């Protein structure tokens, strides 16, 4: 597929564009280039895995209300149990019956392309929506933003093919919003999640893509919208500060450069790429608990 800004690429088709590097693969290169190479060699497109998916279902409810029925399916376990008991009232475990399994298999077969959730997850998502809509700023940002733009472009520095898919872009304020769901959305917990899952690198690639593709001429704000999946369902905007943006952008460019060199040379290094000497020798840093 050619570079450009696309509105209607299905998520599975987006992930299948392997010529373009996304943040997930760049994160692998941070560990080692060989880690990325091994991942790519063993990757296969298994399609969307059908499992209870609170995060993606909530995102659809928040950003694509017109297509909820086309993108989300809600399980009918109670109906399946009732049908199984109607067939055999003596069943002690209806969910293990042939009738139940057939109804369940048919449901999943009929909804292969949809996100699957239970009625209780649907209730949670509705509470999460209430929390977002009760905040005037969040409500305004969501209502006035474009969602799920797929950006494919060549890195301005290296020419490497890159891709990103911001959740929301608010053109008027030149703001990117990334939606995250969490069991605990407190500042203490979310800051740890940011580090562990490297959300800043993902954010930096989104900023780079929006700017280098020309979608925006400036990104004034980058927010993570973090919504808790259970009571009290707090919805919070966290700002990616300009100082941190600059630091992470430098790191992102560094790893993009490493990937580009490996692609062109065919040489994929291991952990020795982290060495500060030409020999590739690493100084072992013993953990603090060992020093006590």
Regions found by a protein language model. Give the residues of each.
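Hydrophobic/aromatic-lined pockets within catalytic cores
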Residues: 62-67, 155, 181-184, 211, ...
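Secondary-structure boundary elements
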Residues: 135-143, 170-176, 211-220
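Conserved catalytic cores of phosphodiester-cleaving nucleases, focusing on short active-site segments
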Residues: 166-190, 206
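Gly/Ser/Thr-rich active-site loops/lids in small-molecule metabolic enzymes
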Residues: 195-204
């Amino acid at each position: 597929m050619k570079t450009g800004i696309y509105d209607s690429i299905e998520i599975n088709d987006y992930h299948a564009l392997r010529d373009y590097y996304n943040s997930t693969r760049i994160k692998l290169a941070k560990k080692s280039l060989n880690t990325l190479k091994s991942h790519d060699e063993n990757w296969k497109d298994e399609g969307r895995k059908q499992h209870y998916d609170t995060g993606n279902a909530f995102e659809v409810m928040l950003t694509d209300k017109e297509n909820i029925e086309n993108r989300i399916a809600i399980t009918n376990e109670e109906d399946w149990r009732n049908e199984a008991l109607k067939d055999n009232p003596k069943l002690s475990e209806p969910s293990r019956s042939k009738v139940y399994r057939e109804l369940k298999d048919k449901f999943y077969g009929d909804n292969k392309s949809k996100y699957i959730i239970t009625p209780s997850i649907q209730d949670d998502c509705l509470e999460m929506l209430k929390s977002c809509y009760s905040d005037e700023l969040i409500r305004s940002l969501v209502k006035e933003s474009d969602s799920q733009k797929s950006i494919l472009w060549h890195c301005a520095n290296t020419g490497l093919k890159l891709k990103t898919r911001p959740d929301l872009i608010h053109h008027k304020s030149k703001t990117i919003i990334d939606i995250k769901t969490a069991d605990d959305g407190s500042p203490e917990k979310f800051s740890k999640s940011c580090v562990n899952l490297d959300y800043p690198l993902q954010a930096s690639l989104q900023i780079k893509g929006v700017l280098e593709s020309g979608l925006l001429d400036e990104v004034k704000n980058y927010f993570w919208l973090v919504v808790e999946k259970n009571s009290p369902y707090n919805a919070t905007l966290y700002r990616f500060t300009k100082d941190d943006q600059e630091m992470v952008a430098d790191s992102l460019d560094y790893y993009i450069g490493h990937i580009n060199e490996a692609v062109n040379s065919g040489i994929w290094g291991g952990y020795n790429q982290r060495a500060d000497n030409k020999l590739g020798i690493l100084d072992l840093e013993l953990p603090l608990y060992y020093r006590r």
